[in-house]
Design a protein with these regions (language model features):
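Short acidic-hydrophobic, aromatic-tinged amphipathic segments that line or gate anion-handling sites
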Residues: 115-123
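Conserved N-terminal substructure of TIR/SEFIR domains
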Residues: 1-62, 131-132
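Short beta-strand/turn micro-motifs composed of small residues
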Residues: 9-10, 70, 98
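Arginine/glycine-rich "motif VI" loop of SF2 helicases in the C-terminal RecA-like domain
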Residues: 27-31, 86-94
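Glycine-rich, charge-decorated loop segments at or immediately adjacent to ligand/cofactor-binding or catalytic sites
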Residues: 102-115
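Conserved TIR/SEFIR loop-to-helix hotspot centered on a Trp-containing motif
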Residues: 72-89
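Short beta-alpha junction loops
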Residues: 94-104
Length: 132
């Protein structure tokens, strides 16, 4: 299976472990999952927002899929909102998954044709990416 280029958008301060779980599934030969991670693995709290946006834009542009991990505080993240809008602008295949069903989704995910994984499980996320 060819690796799917996926930009993973998530609340760095609260949900990094979910991103790491996706990468662990990718690394485990027992899982039929192939992911080429394009996400930025640093906190984006910087005084040079323009430079950060250029790096993130290039990574999103180099991806085919955009996967938003919706954690408890994701809807409050200005960076995640910006990443979603950038991915839509760049016409990426949109996928979203909530870490808990009662998490509030970022409003930017509505009305953009995103495929939703019904739970944060390997099969559900894989299926949503395949449908996107």
């Amino acid at each position: 299976m060819a690796k799917k280029k996926v930009f993973i958008s998530y609340d760095y301060d609260n949900d990094k472990h979910y991103k790491n779980l996706l990468l662990a599934w990718d690394a485990n030969k027992e899982f039929d999952f192939s992911l080429y991670d394009q996400s930025v693995d640093v906190s984006v709290d910087s005084t040079d927002a323009g430079a950060i946006k250029r790096v993130i834009s290039a990574r999103i542009n180099n991806s085919t899929y955009f996967l938003c991990i919706v954690g408890k505080h994701t809807h409050k993240s200005g960076w995640v909102a910006w990443e979603i809008n950038k991915a839509v602008e760049l016409k990426k295949k949109m996928v979203a998954v909530k870490t808990a069903k009662d998490n509030q989704s970022p409003s930017e995910l509505f009305g953009i044709g995103a495929e939703w994984a019904l739970s944060f499980t390997f099969e559900s996320i894989k299926s949503a990416i395949e449908r996107a």
